[in-house]
Amino acid sequence: KKVKTFEEKFAKYTGTKYAIMVNSGSSANLLALSILTNPKINKIQKNSEVITPAVTWATTVYPMVTNNLIPTFVDVDPETYTIDVKRVKDAINKKTSAIMPVHLLGNACDMDKLLKISKNENLSLIEDACEAHGCEFNGKKVGSFGDIGTFSFFLSHHITTIEGGMIVTNNENYYEYAKSMRAFGWIRELKDKKKISSKFKSIDERFLFTNLGFNMRPTEIQGAFGIHQI
């Protein structure tokens, strides 16, 4: 109940439809890219390139490698330490599938320009906002612009649950996959679990797995910490 309440409050806070809590910001990045590369989603193709800034934390990059993606590093704007939009344009080629900007130290990336590029080039846009809770670009919270936004609640961040993370999205399909994939690929939290389980009548729905997945589940204590601070 605490985790669910925190998720609902965080979605409202960021101006997004859905929020899914996980056990760390690193897990949030891994889950986001694992959803978009999932064969059933196939928004980002394996062995394609993802443009990301050279100034970031390691776990922005590791999930790319884990999902057989190729990180393409570009420099940052020295005024803000966020991704240099001109260099993003220069780095795009036929192998590029996504852009993963990082809102760093409370500074927002230029989301208007990045959105325009991603739409014109048909690229996915994943926002790493792990260090930018509450930051806004033109009055809109970061994390809410792209396909998926990620946040961290590590003890040194603006909101802390000691350890914890969140992904936000406006896409219901991504939300359903996130609920399943953060918990082993279970169907337990899915809205269509009865429909799915009816196809596998010999298997107890409590033990039905229909997806790739991880154990990224947060605890109720983490949820309570989050509620208190939101």
Language-model regions, residue ranges each:
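Phosphate-binding glycine-rich loop
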Residues: 2-49, 63-67, 73-75, 140
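PLP-dependent aminotransferase-like
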Residues: 37-104, 108-129, 136
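Short loop/turn motifs at secondary-structure junctions
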Residues: 15, 46, 95, 144-145, ...
